[in-house]
């Protein structure tokens, strides 16, 4: 029960940290590892998909992947009534908060898309079902990779 309350508090805190009026969809889980180990494993997993570090602190990892020209063309074609976008990136943020005394870390993940448009920057939150499913799968794979490796040692 205590873990559930602490985990819920971590999710609520991560929404406050974001500062948005609307709460973006997030995926959250507890991982029994140090923040450094979680960050290292996340980068090892996601660098294969073209992600690089955009921002790094003790409690947050933000990584991004530049859109391909095909993705940009497809987006601009699909949204032809809007102005064209360029220099788009998928941005994945992991917020890492310690939970209790058993070295568990609450990992909260959310995904945004950032594009240059109309002389400024536009940000879209990954709130569709496909994005949420991707985050759930990615976080589950990250947890399995870390905790599975710990059990083998």
Model region roles, listed by residue range:
Residues 1-4:
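Positively charged n-region of N-terminal signal peptides that target proteins for export
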Residues 6-7, 69:
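General helical structural elements
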Residues 17-153:
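Ser/Thr-rich, low-complexity intrinsically disordered terminal regions
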Residues 7-15:
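Bacterial N-terminal signal peptides
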């Amino acid at each position: 029960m205590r873990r559930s309350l602490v985990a819920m508090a971590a999710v609520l805190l991560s929404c406050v940290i974001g500062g948005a009026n609307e709460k973006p969809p997030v995926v959250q889980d507890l991982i029994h590892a140090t923040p450094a180990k979680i960050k290292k494993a996340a980068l090892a997993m996601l660098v294969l998909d073209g992600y690089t570090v955009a921002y790094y602190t003790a409690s947050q990892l933000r990584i991004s992947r530049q859109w391909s020209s095909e993705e940009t063309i497809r987006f601009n074609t699909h949204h032809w009534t809007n102005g064209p976008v360029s220099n788009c990136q998928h941005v994945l943020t992991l917020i890492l908060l310690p939970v209790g005394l058993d070295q568990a870390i609450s990992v909260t993940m959310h995904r945004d898309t950032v594009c240059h448009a109309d002389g400024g920057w536009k940000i879209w939150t990954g709130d569709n079902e496909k994005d949420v499913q991707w985050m759930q799968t990615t976080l589950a794979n990250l947890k399995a990779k870390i905790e599975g490796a710990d059990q083998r040692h």
